């Protein structure tokens, strides 16, 4: 049975490309760029994001370097923070010329103040926002209904992206649907553990507590392409100059449509864009001429008890 959606012109369109057979969806990324090396980092770049002017509110957690949580809430809900008094900690911003400062009162408001001071420092002048993506990957969707499967930790965002695509796409002969994730990684803030431990009076639940050792900031984008060409042909265009394939009347992307959501600031609210020109501008200037440093996209945790790195396995 063929599924249908109604576009903004109230025309009934096939939700599934006509030339595909709808079996059980198996989601698989095709990676074009992946510079990640640290397997101990948790990616949190899409867990809390929302969409501007949609019923999909961003829920950015109250996190900062030095914050302490139970293991089972770390990188998930980030709730039940342990707010017992801590020793002062040294923060390091990994600019080319590192900026080092002491956070006397280890809490969120003090942390934000330290970021403001760092951004005004002479050390920050040595920092240039990266222009090369940290990660770019694509996946064939087969159906718009599969978008939600791409965001297992944020179904609301996936559902919103699906509905936006259903509303905006207006193509009669769709041969392929695909989604892409783009990550630009900015600077990292890390901490040194005080020699006499993090807590002034160690809590009784040391075994279950972990603290945020590093936070990495960056910007992200998610986009969906509906094309009258095959997925492999679309993927191939992004290995070269995709804008040539958009401007060329016979190009792979010339008749394609795109929904682009970009997330670039601490509020974690995605902006909606609808053209390949918008995507090109984002890829060329992801940090908006240095006017944004992004939002937390990676974090790393260590155990309070033994100061060893925390992973899901331990």
Model-derived features: positions:
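Membrane-permeabilization and membrane-interfacing ectodomains
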Residues: 4-314
């Amino acid at each position: 049975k063929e599924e249908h959606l109604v576009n903004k012109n109230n025309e009934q369109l096939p939700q599934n490309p006509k030339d595909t057979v709808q079996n059980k969806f198996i989601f698989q990324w095709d990676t074009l760029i992946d510079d990640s090396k640290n397997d101990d980092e948790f990616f949190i770049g899409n867990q809390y994001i929302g969409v501007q002017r949609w019923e999909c509110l961003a829920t950015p957690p109250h996190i900062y370097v030095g914050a302490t949580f139970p293991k089972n809430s770390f990188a998930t809900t980030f709730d039940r923070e342990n707010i017992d008094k801590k020793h002062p900690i040294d923060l390091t911003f990994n600019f080319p010329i590192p900026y080092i400062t002491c956070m006397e009162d280890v809490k969120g408001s003090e942390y934000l103040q330290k970021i403001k001071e760092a951004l005004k420092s002479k050390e920050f002048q040595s920092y240039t926002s990266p222009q090369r993506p940290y990660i770019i990957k694509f996946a064939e969707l087969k159906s718009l209904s599969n978008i939600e499967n791409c965001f297992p930790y944020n179904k609301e965002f996936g559902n919103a992206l699906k509905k936006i695509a259903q509303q905006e796409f207006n193509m009669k002969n769709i041969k392929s649907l695909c989604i892409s994730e783009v990550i630009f990684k900015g600077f990292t803030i890390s901490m040194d553990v005080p020699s006499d431990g993090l807590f002034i009076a160690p809590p009784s639940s040391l075994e279950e507590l972990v603290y945020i050792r590093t936070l990495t900031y960056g910007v992200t984008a998610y986009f969906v392409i509906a094309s009258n060409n095959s997925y492999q042909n679309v993927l191939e265009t992004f290995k070269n100059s995709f804008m040539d394939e958009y401007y060329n009347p016979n190009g792979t992307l010339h008749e394609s449509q795109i929904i682009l959501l970009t997330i670039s600031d601490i509020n974690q609210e995605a902006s909606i864009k609808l053209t390949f020109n918008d995507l090109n501008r984002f890829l060329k200037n992801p940090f908006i001429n240095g006017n944004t440093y992004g939002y937390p996209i990676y974090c790393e945790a260590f155990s309070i008890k033994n100061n060893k790195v925390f992973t899901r396995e331990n």
